[in-house]
């Protein structure tokens, strides 16, 4: 976490390795297998609301996540003719280890919320769980006529919805 102009090259490269390149490495290997099998398949990418609505001092995370959406679309474009689909889930405010307790409290406090209310601060007033995101991935993987799309799983956050 840092303002983008203050972010070290090392920290930015680390974020790109985790949030973009890891997806590229895995997708490339998967396409090799799927091409060899000749049966099509589906690639799933873990996007983030930060691609559409980055936060202050979250550029090192948001920038590779925005590039990840372009990567997913590139796979859809280049491998759709082989029956290989590609899509992403765009989740927000899922309880993960990304934020430690102090960071979570600071984000919640900045919005006038408790830590628990922070996770329910969406149009549905409902906490979005990892299971919700898994269901979205399953839906995408089983949608035979869908490729190049993003499904948002955030309980409703208009500022972070793809435009």
Where are these regions (language model features)?
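Conserved mid-core segment of classical short-chain dehydrogenase/reductases
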Residues: 1-13, 57-60, 113
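Catalytic Tyr-X3-Lys loop
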Residues: 5-24, 44, 68, 119, ...
